[in-house]
Amino acid sequence: QIRPGHYAMWTGRIYFLAKEGGFEQFIVLMTFAVQKPLCLVSALFAGLILSSCSSSQRQVEAPARLPAYSFVPGKTAVLHNGKAIPPRNAPVQVKRAIAAANSLVNKPYRMGGGHRKHYDTHYDCSGSTSFVLKEAGLLTSTRHSKLFLNYGQKGTGDWISVYAKDGHVFLVICGLRFDTSGSGRRGEGPRWRVDGRNTRNFLVRHPTGL
């Protein structure tokens, strides 16, 4: 039996079992010919595991609590009717990310939403995070929250930060938090939020160069 967060190898494929709250899904990480020598396949599998372990040792843990939004001229976005307005000097990719996030505001929450199709009627935390980064050209395929633990580079970004742990992920873009939780209301979908939130056990990553 495979537990969430673990790898497995059989029938010509290497799998990763991701968990999003109570939702579990196998993700194919690598395929290979069954006829390929077992020693070579085992070496590839071992290399994948070691790489994952090595990456996790270089992670940066988020502080125990993310502070509430604070306006900084030329650096932070501002909210207007629930939508974010980016600073004029923000990079194009950041503006695209904000526009993508704005398009999801008021979408309802559903576990697995945004995973089966890019433009969906409902989104969960990793579905909405993936949508925003993909629209900005900063991600090529939808990920579950666990897989964001190795996204981009470690630490907070100048413009975009990704806060991730096994079971949840959210973004901070230009000082505003884009999250599906944190308001205390169950079933609420992706929203811009200005209040602080508990980030204990989260790791923080950012897109390269941002």
Predicted regions and their residues:
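Short hydrophobic targeting helices and cationic amphipathic motifs
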Residues: 7, 16-17
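Bacterial N-terminal signal peptides that target proteins for export
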Residues: 30-41
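Post-signal peptide N-terminal segment of mature Sec-exported envelope proteins
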Residues: 56-92
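...with weaker cross-activation on analogous glycine-rich loops/strands in unrelated enzymes
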Residues: 87-98, 130, 136-210
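Active-site nucleophilic cysteine motif
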Residues: 117-136
